[in-house]
Amino acid sequence: MADQRMDISSTISDFMSPDPADLISSSLSTSGVDCNRKRKGSSTDYQLDGFPFEEGMDTDKDDQHGRLDYADQQGRIKNAREAHSQIEKRRRDKMNSFIDELASLVPTCNAMSRKLDKLTVLRMAVQHMKTLRGATNPYTEANYKPAFLSDDELKHLILRAADGFLFVVGCDRGKILFVSESVFKILNYSQNDLIGQSLFDYLHPKDIAKVKEQLSSSDTAPRERLIDAKTGLPVKTDITPGPSRLCSGARRSFFCRMKCNRPSVKVEDKDFPSTCSKKKADRKSFCTIHSTGYLKSWPPTKMGLDEDNEPDNEGCNLSCLVAIGRLHPHVVPQPVNGEIRVKPTEYVSRHAIDGKFVFVDQRATAILAYLPQELLGTSCYEYFHQDDIGHLAECHRQVLQTREKITTNCYKFKIKDGSFITLRSRWFSFMNPWTKEVEYIVSTNTVVSTSVLDSGDAAFPQLAASPHSMDSVLQAGEGGPKRSHPTVPGIPGGTRAGAGKIGRMIAEEIMEIHRIRGSSPSSCGSSPLNITSTPPPDTSSPGSKKILNGGTPDISSAGLLSGQIQDSSGYPYSDNSSILGENSHIGIDMIDNDQGSSSPSNDEAAMAVIMSLLEADAGLGGPVDFSDLPWPL
């Protein structure tokens, strides 16, 4: 037992106290492990008792692996960039191909002589889509209607509401493709008479160009100008307008004159004294039509037309104008009761000093039924009623002599259908500030309703009927007895042939008065239309018409010619007579009539005084001595 205990104790002691050599070897092995954990940057070789190890070799391997990883990463980034560039390039190429395809589909882009930028192509494409919207919009199609209405019933309702006729005209040649039966009520032509005919054959010659412009307007001339995004300059187009490029769905509204198939009346040639009367009679065969509609395109198969004779169309759609024509009213309806205050129906016109129209407001068409170009160049006296010419001629004289506004009484004016409408005008003259001459007369013409005339309003005085007023004016101007004026066939009564020369006579009369005033010594330096000087006392007997030999005519208030009246401005005008009439001319013959006071000495003295006056007026002489005159001043 004791031996066993000794063996166990020795074993434990050996275990608890190891051999020094074992301790050294274990410590070296532990230190070797620690040396391996030093930083990679060291290149020193450690060697202890036959145990060498190298740290530098491990760090070189790590650096090599790091460089390889960096190169691989850079390669991957480069490959990714190249792949992105290829993707972007393919996207740009695809977009450019789509832009080119879109440009080939848009007519305005396809016809350009140079390549357009992308923004311009897109802008043109958007504009082209807007022009095509009218053809695809269901609200503009004929099938947009209630289900319980048939096509014929809808057509009759539209024509009844519009009070006109429906027509379809081809835009290429103006051929009438369809017209409704209601055209007979307006133009007195049947449906079969117009279908297949050219619209231009039934238009007024002056309106053909306007209608052609309405039919040929296309999307090649848009309202807004296209601007190149790169250069900033407007894009020029070389497109030739064609039927396939018309703006389908574009609205149209215009006025034109069309022939009316009125019953012909056989009139012998002897009834027409001149060709002018024939022209006036032919002018009444046209009526003003207001056409409103839109352009429309149909495939030729839908129209059922034969295209064998149309090789130029190349299978394109047929472009037409679908419109409703309504007879344009010439008189605006007036309110029945005078209680409602409305804007007066009026128009403005401008006349030359002889009364001829030089400008007419467009509102005159709705009142008189004349187009402005029909009135230009004609005299206003041709449209006045013969009972009102005397009063209007007097107003004409006053407006040429004064600067004030002249308001006429109510008078009758002939409209296009031959009847008369009651007007009241306000006239004033425009004077050139440099030449002091009247340039033109401005007239504001207001329509007077029948209810106002019947009420006898004092603000609208009426003229008393005087059948011989025009004859008196013509007789005074011509200086002869009254002559009979034949009535022209085809022109309604109420006006006289030759009335247009009244305005010319009045203009010549006023010009003669201005000339006499301008040549008078007492009127030098003053305007012929603004004479307010006080006349010298008249020593001759009242009512005397004779002028002393060698003297100058004294046109003052005390020495006026017979039948003349002096207005508020001191300017004389005649009452229903002309200053250029018979026994009223001022000339050498009238001066020579006074033989009692004529002698060579008196003539020489008068001539000397006149020459002195001229020299004094020109600043060439001294004061004038009037003591040598043979008559008292």
From Swiss-Prot:
Cross-link for Glycyl lysine isopeptide (Lys-Gly) (interchain with G-Cter in SUMO), residue positions: K266
One term of GO molecular function: RNA polymerase II cis-regulatory region sequence-specific DNA binding
PAC domain sequence ranges: 408-451
Gene Ontology biological-process annotations: circadian rhythm; positive regulation of DNA-templated transcription; positive regulation of protein acetylation; regulation of transcription by RNA polymerase II; response to redox state
Matching CDD domains: bHLH-PAS_ARNTL_PASD3, PAS
Crosslinked positions (Glycyl lysine isopeptide (Lys-Gly) (interchain with G-Cter in SUMO2 and SUMO3)): K259
Residues bearing the modification N6-acetyllysine: K545
Biased composition (Low complexity): 518-528
Region: Disordered, residue numbers: 1-65, 469-499, 518-578
A GO CC term attached to the entry: aryl hydrocarbon receptor complex
Alphabetic keyword roster: Acetylation, Activator, Biological rhythms, Cytoplasm, DNA-binding, Isopeptide bond, Nucleus, Phosphoprotein, Repeat, Transcription, Transcription regulation, Ubl conjugation
Cited Gene3D superfamilies: Helix-loop-helix DNA-binding domain, PAS domain
Motif, Nuclear export signal 1: chain positions: 149-159
Tissue: Expressed in pineal gland and retina.
Residue stretches in coiled coil: none
Composition bias, Polar residues: 24-33, 563-578
Location(s), subcellular: Nucleus; Cytoplasm; Nucleus, PML body
Annotated site (Important for interaction with CLOCK): L132
Site feature (Interaction with E-box DNA) residues: H84, I87, E88, R92
PANTHER family given in the database record: CIRCADIAN PROTEIN CLOCK/ARNT/BMAL/PAS
Cited function: Transcriptional activator which forms a core component of the circadian clock. The circadian clock, an internal time-keeping system, regulates various physiological processes through the generation of approximately 24 hour circadian rhythms in gene expression, which are translated into rhythms in metabolism and behavior. It is derived from the Latin roots 'circa' (about) and 'diem' (day) and acts as an important regulator of a wide array of physiological functions including metabolism, sleep, body temperature, blood pressure, endocrine, immune, cardiovascular, and renal function.
Name of the featured protein: Basic helix-loop-helix ARNT-like protein 1
The gene coding this protein: BMAL1
